[in-house]
Amino acid sequence: IAYMWNNTLQPSSNPENPDLLSIYIPEWPERIMIAYPETGLTLILGSDYFGEAKKSFLRMAMYKVKEEGGLGFHAGSKLLRVYDKNHELKDVGFIMFGLSGTGKTTLTIHDHGLTGEEKSIVRQDDVIFMDENGYCVGTETGFFIKTEGLNPEQQGVLYKAATTDRAILENVKVYDDGKVDFDDVSLTSNGRGIILRSEVPNTDDTIDLEKANKIIFITRRNDIVPPVVKLNPDQALEAFMLGESIETSAGDPTKAGQSKRCVGTNPFIMGPEIEEGLRLKEILQNNPDMECYILNTGSVGAKGDFKGEKLSIKVSTTIMKEIARDTINWVEDEEWGYEVPVQVNGIDIEKYNPRNYYTEEEYKVLASRLKAERKAWLAKYELAQSTRS
């Protein structure tokens, strides 16, 4: 476990005197994690899962960053260098929030089909620290990826990195001859791998992001949430506090498909969660050049035996590319208050309009249910809905 964690870190300037310490006792009869933020100590009892080591250190680091006036986010980061609608070459920084299984790593590492002077540059996959100006400090030189179903056709970059001699695999089927089978989930569906950032194309020597120009809240819903919506700061606060998606096999396989909410899509938060949401809203209000979006990587229109029109990786990566280029035409959705796209280059966006798949009454029932769920969740934080969402 220590070897795995070391493969995600930059060299330490003072390895003999660590700021944070985590102790595993896997033989403990109960599974309990105890964190002491004042001293930086975490006890991991009854588990030998590497993810608990990663979570223990990043949880503590986020807490200390918050104490110093910043924010720690469970988010990936990248830079898209694109020609905008005025044909000017610009660097656009993205950070992407997302629970396990929503596609955060896939979207972080994807090249978006950019060529020539246009390119995608990967910064971080999992945790960043943001200051009041939107500058994001990176934390790791390795990526902790979900391996279930990994294949060279759809996720070539990740597959190649995960099958090198330097990759470290956990809960993955490996045969005697060394062949790796990412489709075999007989051990568990939560297969994982640590890949080195240097093994991933489109990386450079920098893990920091100069500015988070675009903030993406990734969700995975299957009915009435559009492929992408654009948010104002109040709506962004709500999206952050909702941390909305559905459960996947990477989380709790017994609840896969059920609604799930986690503030900031971040299981690392210590202290009052509302403080983090309000601080993010303040940063957005003070930096009007930072824009927020919800990106749905699930499907739209699910009903009965129809699982919905799938929002493919190509759809999501194209949307992000056109957000960076500032070429999307937006209109306000009168029912929800946020903005929705009416034209996206490279996509027949009307094909993914949720309203096309339901009768007016069916849509009304689903919308009322979702609004009620959101209202009940936000009420826990004494946060009244400030929008129609």
State the predicted function of each range.
Residues 82-116:
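Glycine-rich phosphate-binding P-loop
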Residues 1-93, 118, 131-389:
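A noncatalytic interaction/capping subdomain that flanks phosphate/NTP-handling catalytic cores
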Residues 112-127, 134-135:
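Post-Walker A helix-loop "phosphate-sensing" segment adjacent to the P-loop in P-loop NTPases
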Residues 98-100, 123, 293:
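Short conserved micro-motifs on helix faces and helix-strand junctions that flank
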